[in-house]
A protein has these predicted regions:
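C-terminal hydrophobic structural anchor segments
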Residues: 138-186
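Outer-membrane beta-barrel proteins
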Residues: 3-8, 55-58, 86-89, 117-121, ...
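Transmembrane beta-barrel domains of outer membrane proteins
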Residues: 33-35, 45, 69-71, 99-101, ...
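Transmembrane beta-strands of outer-membrane beta-barrel proteins
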Residues: 43-46, 73-77, 108-110, 141-143, ...
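Outer-membrane beta-barrel pore domains and translocons
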Residues: 1, 29, 47-51, 80-84, ...
């Protein structure tokens, strides 16, 4: 998909675990897109795709999703509207993805998103920051603070997450990712922990890319 900051493969992300914004989707699109580069800095993309919930085979509903992206100097605004493949046909997704090199070694990435559907009477909104510092050619450390709000009717439920990640590159294709993550929600919407307000976990992963 053209939408969002993170991707499915862990080799393409700095953090090993994914954000709430990523889990909210869309994950992928099947269809047609047209890319146009107006200059070295400015680009546009137009798309007509199946609903992102339709991941294989034919599209039985003949409902579609329309996509648009504009990018300027590494900052991207994304829009998707239409059917989601889960029974709703008026879902609007808005997304900003970008980042800035604040110094030779420090990078700030930003992802902000909003989604809403009158059919579903719900949606979500959230923001995640990606603070990453390169200490050497082989080791980087990053912090991803995130806030996510899920809406349903007149009710909102909020969850925040803080992820500290270290990346150690052993070779050009193999890296070790060590991570500590803390999730907190007074509304108890942490996935897999429906009765808990707080959750913490640690992960060590070897990621090989080819």
């Amino acid at each position: 998909t053209f939408y969002g900051y993170e991707v499915i493969s862990p080799s393409g992300n700095f953090n090993y675990s994914v954000s709430y914004l990523f889990n909210a989707g869309p994950f992928s699109h099947t269809g047609f897109k047209l890319d146009y580069a107006a200059s070295d800095d400015l680009s546009f993309m137009f798309a007509l795709t199946n609903p992102h919930g339709v991941t294989s085979g034919a599209n039985p509903s003949n409902d579609y999703q329309y996509g648009f992206q504009t990018g300027y100097k590494g900052q991207y605004f994304n829009l998707a509207y239409g059917a989601d493949g889960f029974g709703f046909t008026d879902v609007l997704y808005l997304d900003y993805t970008g980042g800035f090199d604040l110094s030779d070694s420090f990078f700030l990435g930003i992802n902000a998103a909003y989604a809403n559907s009158s059919d579903a009477d719900g949606g979500y909104q959230g923001v995640a920051l990606y603070l990453q510092n390169e200490f050497s050619e082989t080791f980087s450390l990053g912090l991803r603070p995130e806030m996510f709000i899920a809406s349903s009717g007149s009710d909102d439920a909020t969850v925040s997450a803080f992820t500290l990640t270290g990346n150690l590159s052993l070779t050009d294709t193999l890296k070790i990712i060590s991570e500590f993550r803390y999730d907190t929600s007074d509304d108890m919407i942490i996935p897999g922990f429906p009765t808990d307000k707080n959750m913490s976990g640690a992960t060590i992963a070897a990621v090989y890319s080819f």
